Swiss-Prot record:
GO terms for biological process: intracellular signal transduction; programmed cell death; protein phosphorylation; regulation of MAPK cascade; signal transduction. Keywords: ATP-binding, Kinase, Magnesium, Metal-binding, Nucleotide-binding, Serine/threonine-protein kinase, Transferase. Its cofactor is Mg(2+). Belongs to the protein kinase superfamily. STE Ser/Thr protein kinase family. STE20 subfamily. It comes from the Eukaryota. GO terms for molecular function: ATP binding; metal ion binding; protein serine kinase activity; protein serine/threonine kinase activity. The keyword rRNA-binding does not apply. This is Serine/threonine-protein kinase dst1. PROSITE patterns: PROTEIN_KINASE_ATP, PROTEIN_KINASE_DOM.
Amino acid sequence: MAIKKPINVKQLSDKLGVPILPDDPQTIYHIQERLGKGSFGQVFKAVHFANGKVVAIKIISLDDQEAIKDVRKEISILAECNYPNIVQYFGSYFKDHQLWIVMEYCGGGSVSDLLQVIDTISEDEIALICREALKGLNYLHEFKKIHRDIKGGNILLNDRGEVKLADFGVSAQLFNTFSKRNTFVGTPYWMAPEVIQENKYDGKADVWSLGITAIEMAEGLPPNSNVHPMRVIFMIPREESPALTDKSIWSDKFQDFISKCLTKDPAERPTAKELLNHEFIQTKKPLSILSDLVENCKTLINNSSMFEDEDEEEGNYSTFVEKKTPSDDEKENNNNTVTNYSTVITKDDDDGSNNYSTVITKDEMYSTVITKDDAQTDDDNNNFSTVITKEDPPTDEESDSSCSSSSSSSRNITSPISKRKPRQPITNSPKISPISSNNINKIPADNVVSSNQATTTTTTTTTTTTTAASTTTDQDEGDVKNIVNKFQLNKPITSSNSTSVTPQKPPFPSNNTTTTSNINTPIKPSNGLKKSNSNTPVQLKTSGDKTPTTTPLKNISNNNSVIYNNSNNINNNNNNNIIAPKSPSPTTGQKIIKTNSGGVLKSSGGLSSKRSPSSKPKHSSSSKEPKESLSENLQNIYRNDCTIQLPFLTLNNISSDYLLSIDYRYNDFKSSLDDLCADPNLISSKLSFSPYIGNLIKSLSYHKDIQENELMTPKESVQNTKIVNDLSSTVKTIFRL
């Protein structure tokens, strides 16, 4: 392990701009529990040993220089603030290459936390929260500070109902009354139009964010929450100001307050001080209604936790392993000595409605039986069993011996499946190859049992299952015939919820109506991509398309083998999916099916799927966020402290002069968009956008120019093509091309 470089505490104190207390924090505070992960580290609840005061401690590793750079802003703001509506800062400590920042603890959580419990907040409660938040903002603005990230998640409440502004990680200091910021920072859904357009802005940007937060408290979510964040960045400056969805249930003064906060022109938008005189804010309700709100939410959470604990206790689980050697009489029937092992896992509910049983047996003849029976229903198709065997077809005597051995080993096993109806067998199950091209989408190969194997193990499986279930005598003959494989071999695998709408990954319109992806013609990397005729309509690529090279791909060693399709193996049957590499684009709503080393089909799409570490590509993709920090000029364009970023951009190899240039040939956005859409009228209507989006298109033009005009190695060509596809997909998402 590498030895960490010693840190000079005095230099660290000078760097942060606040004194570092010399004491060991663990001798002063007792850590109780982790509250979560903050913007730049972990946050813990702690208690002061001497006075018993509860505090929140943010612990940050000093090895992360970016985190230190960002947290310095928060500490400098908090250390200078002393106001009831601002989270109080108590001091900083240094221990084990970690910075401990001690702050005020707010036991009520954030407004967003409350909305997770009660969905919406009443109008009187919203008025109080907005009034207290405006007091905190007015204090900040008078000291020439901007919060820049006001939202429900950064407005905290304590147990007494007091409202505190928190998380000053992106706050900025205004050095004089007339100075304004012009950096792109904040959370997209709460962001003011002037911030997105990178115009000059001041504390009135916080007022806009508070208006969005008021809608968030009233409706549970901010406006446009079902839209992709990058799309929202484009929508906010162009569309009308948001408003409450159902105005009939809210008072006129509340609606007027929101409209004042969400005035598009910042020059006409009132300040925080002016809004403190608004009729909606002049409420006579006491802060005790907020403390009652916090208490009610805590009660609901505690009751919910109690119900969950009771549900877990209702399930009766039993697991036992039994090893038994057959008796002398059983050995006489079989010349070989057989030792049987069985593992049984059962769960029984009192009402008998949810009964699960798993029986696994293994003997010296290497037969394995895995059986899972769901609760008895009128539809027998809901009950299924899987039989896997490694033995040769036994003789009649061996079958009889196997039956008696299984009965002996499982004699004391009791299972709830004894009350279930016999299942009807499926006859003439076809033998299917696990990697057959005709059946690649129908059934996982590991679960396929051939017809002769099913016949071989019917007797053994039946005896194990029926004895484990303690079946009655009227089931003797029926159960021998009822161990079957209930997989539906003729149904393709289907995926649901592939187009679920969420703020992170909404479905985007596509020109494709079939289930297959477009197959592109291979290109030669050495010659680059040729520009298409501008008179010829350009067919848009889908987000799942890849641009392969003519260089043969050999020995691709990955746990999940990827099958590249060409024009010779395309099947027009709608039931067959094309197996293709997964696109890195975030806009795809289509599920890609690929096989693992065992031939089992695996879904890699969908919002809830997670890739295991073993399924990561062998080579790091150029679409990853660069590890190196960007130059100062690039920081002005793609800021690290911006909440919403494009993580796949690799910008270190792009000249700062290129991105910062105002020369027309570097800003010909129309030609870049022409390659993505053939409709000139549509393009001309999309050319009004912020410099931030313009720089994105500049990056696209840069990489396309390299692809078309410079010689590259095959590897460089593939990487550059991938970047072009990623950027093109993002631009098409923003402009809905």
